[in-house]
C-alpha cells in the first residue's frame, strides 16, 4: 500500500516539491533557520496547523520582540501554550540566534544524529522537534515520530500499543530504526518517507 503511494506520480511530485523547498532552506540565511526552529518549538504538543498559524502571527517579531509581546501575539491568535512558548522562543533566540546555522551545519553534514543531540540543548526541543528542524533545513536521515507515524506503524503491525506522549529517547531511537528499515525497503530517506506517511494519514503535505 505504501509502495504504491511512493510510486504514485502525482503524490511523488508533490512530496519531491516539498523536499526541494527543504533543500533550499539549507542554503538560506540564519533568519530562515531560526524561523524553522521557532516553528518546531511551536509544533511541540500542538498541531502543525496551529503552530504554523502562530508563526505567521508572530512574523518578524520572533527576531526582536520581547517575551511579553510574543506572549500577547500568541494569545491573540489563539495559540494554546502562549506563556510557555513565548518563554522558549526568547530562550532559544538568546542561546542560538546568530550562530544556529554556523554551529549545526558542520555537525549535520558529518553526522545528523550528533546535530540532533546538539539541538536537544535548546529548551523546548525534544527528539521529534530536533528531527523536524533538521528535516526542514534539508537533512533527511532522521525520523519525525508523531502520533500519525505511530498510528501508521501500529496498523501495519510494525509495533504494538505506544503512548506517544511519553516516548523515551531510547524508545524513539528504536522506533526510528523501524522506520529506517521501511524507508530502505522503499529506497527513500526516512525523512522523505515521513512526508508520504503524513500524506497517507492526513491527505496533505504541509509539515
UniProtKB/Swiss-Prot annotation:
Query: What does UniProt list as catalytic?
Result: 128, 146
* UniProt keyword DNA repair present: yes
What does the record give under GO molecular function? class I DNA-(apurinic or apyrimidinic site) endonuclease activity; hydrolase activity, hydrolyzing N-glycosyl compounds
* Entry-linked Pfam families: Ogg-HhH
Give the positions of the site Important for guanine/8-oxoguanine distinction.
Answer: 207
User: Which GO BP terms, alphabetically?
Assistant: base-excision repair
InterPro entries tied to this protein? DNA_glyclase/AP_lyase_Ogg (IPR012092), DNA_glycosylase (IPR011257), HhH-GPD_domain (IPR003265), HhH_base_excis_C (IPR023170)
Q: Which family does it belong to?
A: Belongs to the type-2 OGG1 family.
- What does the function comment of this entry state? Catalyzes the excision of an oxidatively damaged form of guanine (7,8-dihydro-8-oxoguanine = 8-oxoG) from DNA. Also cleaves the DNA backbone at apurinic/apyrimidinic sites (AP sites).
Q: State the protein's name.
A: 8-oxoguanine DNA glycosylase/AP lyase
Which gene is annotated as encoding this protein in its UniProt record?
ogg
